């Protein structure tokens, strides 16, 4: 019987592949037989991750591009097509926050750093839209494929301090649903877009907000754990099941859906 969860020989582009979650994604997909496009800004890290995948028997290519620069993305797409001849999937994993956009408790909410907020919005929202414009067009023209966006619990629950990030992720949820409808109507039932909304996972961007230098939890970190029924942070590999499902034929009638992978954070009232 055919394995409907298989991603073997699918060419899947992963943006943000030089980050923590992206690293987990590319390794898991390569282990499952996918051909991975490792897209990121840091050439040294991207090349090393490709080297690691190849040494472990997988197939991958480094695609050096900034997700907010259309010309770089177009060049990356051509490189992938020249190497592999097709693109079957896209994972929009690039994103994150920046210190200047974090709103501290003592900061006047009427004196926000608008420039920083715009930068965070640009990275997270348009850093999802632009790769979709470039790679998604190729996927759609081929007649079959899947696009997976990475959202966040910050799109569903009010999480203090991270306004720009929260707004961007909320917009990604809206974009996912809107674009899924248009893809289905214009290109048929074999082109899909969905999103994964992770709960709280430790990343380079949020580590200083959630943990102290000695590894203990900050007050904010403890609040997150308190409001997560599973009583812990998520691990990157715990996103893989949802990711593979959405990229594979196992989810062929699923589109416009935001899948929560959050240890129950989104459903718990705190009581």
What kind of feature is each model-predicted range?
Residues 11, 18-19, 42:
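Conserved glycine-rich cofactor-binding loop
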Residues 110-129, 144, 148, 167, ...:
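Catalytic Tyr-X3-Lys loop
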Residues 187, 192, 254-256:
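Short, small/polar-rich loop/turn modules that mediate ligand/substrate recognition or access, typified
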Residues 152:
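Residue(s) in the substrate-gating loop at a strand-loop-helix junction
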């Amino acid at each position: 019987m055919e394995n409907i969860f298989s991603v073997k020989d699918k060419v899947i582009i992963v943006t943000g592949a030089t980050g923590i979650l992206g690293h987990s994604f590319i390794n898991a997909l390569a282990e499952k037989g996918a051909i991975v496009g490792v897209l990121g800004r840091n050439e040294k890290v991207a090349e090393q991750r490709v080297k690691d995948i190849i040494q472990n028997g997988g197939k991958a290519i480094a695609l050096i591009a900034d997700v907010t620069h259309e010309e770089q993305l177009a060049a990356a797409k051509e490189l992938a097509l020249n190497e592999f001849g097709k693109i079957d999937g896209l994972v929009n994993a690039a994103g994150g926050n920046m210190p200047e956009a974090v709103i501290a408790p003592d900061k006047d909410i009427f004196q926000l750093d608008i420039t920083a907020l715009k930068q965070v919005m640009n990275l997270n929202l348009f850093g999802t839209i632009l790769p979709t414009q470039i790679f998604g067009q190729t996927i759609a023209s081929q007649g079959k494929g899947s696009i997976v966006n990475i959202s966040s619990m910050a799109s569903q629950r009010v999480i203090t301090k991270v306004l720009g990030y929260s707004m961007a992720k909320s917009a990604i949820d809206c974009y996912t649903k809107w674009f899924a409808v248009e893809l289905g109507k214009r290109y048929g039932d074999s082109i899909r877009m969905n999103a994964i909304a992770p709960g709280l996972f430790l990343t380079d961007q949020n580590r200083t907000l959630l943990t102290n230098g000695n590894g203990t939890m900050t007050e904010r970190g403890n609040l997150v754990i308190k409001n997560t029924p599973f009583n812990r942070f998520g691990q990157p590999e715990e996103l893989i099941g949802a990711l593979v499902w959405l990229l594979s034929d196992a989810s062929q009638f699923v589109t416009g859906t935001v899948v929560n992978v959050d240890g129950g954070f989104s459903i718990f009232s705190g009581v």
